[in-house]
Amino acid sequence: MDNGMLSRFIMTKTLLVFCISMTLSSHFGFSQMPTSSVQDETNDNITIFTRILDGLLDGYDNRLRPGLGERITQVRTDIYVTSFGPVSDTEMEYTIDVFFRQSWKDERLRFKGPMQRLPLNNLLASKIWTPDTFFHNGKKSIAHNMTTPNKLLRLEDDGTLLYTMRLTISAECPMQLEDFPMDAHACPLKFGSYAYPNSEVVYVWTNGSTKSVVVAEDGSRLNQYHLMGQTVGTENISTSTGEYTIMTAHFHLKRKIGYFVIQTYLPCIMTVILSQVSFWLNRESVPARTVFGVTTVLTMTTLSISARNSLPKVAYATAMDWFIAVCYAFVFSALIEFATVNYFTKRGWAWDGKKALEAAKIKKKERELILNKSTNAFTTGKLTHPPNIPKEQLPGGTGNAVGTASIRASEEKTSESKKTYNSISKIDKMSRIVFPILFGTFNLVYWATYLNREPVIKGATSPK
């Protein structure tokens, strides 16, 4: 009995210990299994990706393009513009900051793994084949490297690569300035392969002609232009090394006229109006009218020089040049008009003065003759007149004295009236009407012509 009881006791204790251990293991051991499995899975993925990357570059030659000898490599491109501007008129160039995306397929980089898309470090871009894209009209291009190279590289399991770079490009923008400052321009951005002709590499737009070039809503950095929109297309050029495809994106710009109205147009208009004030001054006011004429001519000269400083030295006249030239003609004509009036005014003074001098001499002789006769008659009458005849009836009496006084008064009045030799010039009268009408008509025709017509954008090509 004792042995049986001892055996049962031992078995019971053993069973109890087993149950307790199972309970503890279920509480602690099973709770640690998920973490351990996640870590193991992560480690396995890292190991798998490492093996994939190591295997991708085994026997890979980045000197050879994908599909060499079998097919043409197609490179799909699109552009996202983060900042557009500024635009330099004098240099005929513009600056643009973009995310430049390129996508192509390289069957040598196909892989099988737990993920369909594999994000890669930008260092791998130097170890694989990438398109030799360059910008045809680029003057200066910068690839951003702060804080690390701004590049993105993604690889899909079928070998499709997405390569994105952030670039700042200064590109040429040919401008036709005949309509300046009411002009519009299409600034192109042209890029393509440097070495591969169409028989080896072709470029296409990723999202067609409408969405392949997108400008951010707050991406415009323009003070003198409105960014009206953008269009894309393709061009083909033939050289001695083959035929190449050029991808083109045109950014359509319309100039803002407000700055030039304040800076040039209003001062020119006010100067012309000021020059016409001289028509209302007396033609005898030679200093005042001379100051008006010379000052306005010098002002127009200064305005014409300053207006040209913001433009390149083109060989043709712009719309602003025509306006300034006409205003200059009006101002100079006002000065010539004054010179003409002044010339005839001097001649009028000379002839009127000569006639007045001759008339004064004749009147003086007549007056002396009359006075002599009156004095002699008065003296004779005083000595010999009959006593019954009043003095008023005698020749040379008081009546004659009154007549002589009236003659003198009329002569003085005549001489006073002769002092004003010149009336208002007929040329001035005509100029007061003709000059404002002509200048107003010119402004009406000028602004109606340039503001109401559609802007002519030269250099833009229709999308293909």
From Swiss-Prot:
The protein's UniProt keywords, in alphabetical order, are:
Cell membrane, Chloride, Chloride channel, Disulfide bond, Glycoprotein, Ion channel, Ion transport, Isopeptide bond, Ligand-gated ion channel, Membrane, Postsynaptic cell membrane, Receptor, Signal, Synapse, Transmembrane, Transmembrane helix, Transport, Ubl conjugation
- For the Cytoplasmic compartment, the record's topological domain ranges are 341-429
Sugar attachment sites are 45, 145, 207, 236
Binding positions (4-aminobutanoate): 101, 164
Give the span(s) annotated as Disordered: 382-414
| Per UniProt, location of the Glycyl lysine isopeptide (Lys-Gly) (interchain with G-Cter in ubiquitin) cross-link in this chain | 355
The free-text tissue note of the record is:
Expressed in brain areas such as cerebral cortex, hippocampal formation and olfactory bulb granular layer.
Give the reactions, separated by semicolons, that this protein catalyses.
chloride(in) = chloride(out)
Membrane spanning residue stretches: 261-281, 287-308, 319-340, 430-450
Disulfide-linked positions: 173-187
Gene Ontology MF terms? chloride channel activity; GABA receptor binding; GABA-A receptor activity; GABA-gated chloride ion channel activity; ligand-gated monoatomic ion channel activity involved in regulation of presynaptic membrane potential; transmitter-gated monoatomic ion channel activity involved in regulation of postsynaptic membrane potential
One Pfam family for this entry, by name? Neur_chan_LBD
Family the UniProt entry places it in = Belongs to the ligand-gated ion channel (TC 1.A.9) family. Gamma-aminobutyric acid receptor (TC 1.A.9.5) subfamily. GABRA5 sub-subfamily.
- Complexes and interactors: Heteropentamer, formed by a combination of alpha (GABRA1-6), beta (GABRB1-3), gamma (GABRG1-3), delta (GABRD), epsilon (GABRE), rho (GABRR1-3), pi (GABRP) and theta (GABRQ) chains, each subunit exhibiting distinct physiological and pharmacological properties.
Q: What does this protein do?
A: Alpha subunit of the heteropentameric ligand-gated chloride channel gated by gamma-aminobutyric acid (GABA), a major inhibitory neurotransmitter in the brain. GABA-gated chloride channels, also named GABA(A) receptors (GABAAR), consist of five subunits arranged around a central pore and contain GABA active binding site(s) located at the alpha and beta subunit interface(s). When activated by GABA, GABAARs selectively allow the flow of chloride anions across the cell membrane down their electrochemical gradient.
Its recorded name reads Gamma-aminobutyric acid receptor subunit alpha-5
**Organism, scientific name:** Rattus norvegicus (Rat)
Identify the gene encoding this protein.
Answer: Gabra5
